[in-house]
Amino acid sequence: KKKKILIILLLPLIYQSVPTEILKLKIFDTFVKKQEPSGNFVILNITEQDVENEGGYPFPRKTLAQIQVDLINEGAIGVGWVISFPQADRMGGDEVFAQTLGYVPSVIAMFEDGKGNYPKPTGTVVKGSHVSGIVSMGVKENLNTLKDNTLQGLAIAPTEVDQLVRRIPLLVSTPNNNWIPSFGTQIYKALFSVKTYIIKTNDNGIEEISI
């Protein structure tokens, strides 16, 4: 009887072990279908050659403003910058960059810093019981000049136990039960001029998010 009890007690530990969790993730991977590019989104990387051409990094905000204008002239209906701008530009280009961010729906990134500060909560409607989701320990916001003229979203990509990224949260919660939108969620919100998130929950957590 003692052996049977011991085996039963060990089963949850085995099921939650790292090798077992990795196996579960690999099985999950087999069910994920490869998605073909839609052609609606384009990723533009800043390369080492770009940095060399500009004489170093970070680029002056006036240069970023020109890039923003160039993208718009090439047909972009929205621009997302996966770069944060918490400090003022020593070259004095924040005003012109902020102006160009307002030409089309735009989003700039925020990143976690663990210092317990958070952006002002946005409009959120929760249908169902409260759930916490992924909790952030602090976010570094962007410069007021920029964030007041565009949207900012949290760039976060937590890894699984095998150090691969499979899931990117749409919203992240704070210890005081507010919600921080992710970068991708803000892109959608900007393009469709949405003001409020509707979060539907169930016993398992967040069921769906409507924007």
Positions of predicted regions on the chain:
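Non-transmembrane functional regions of envelope-associated proteins
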Residues: 1-211
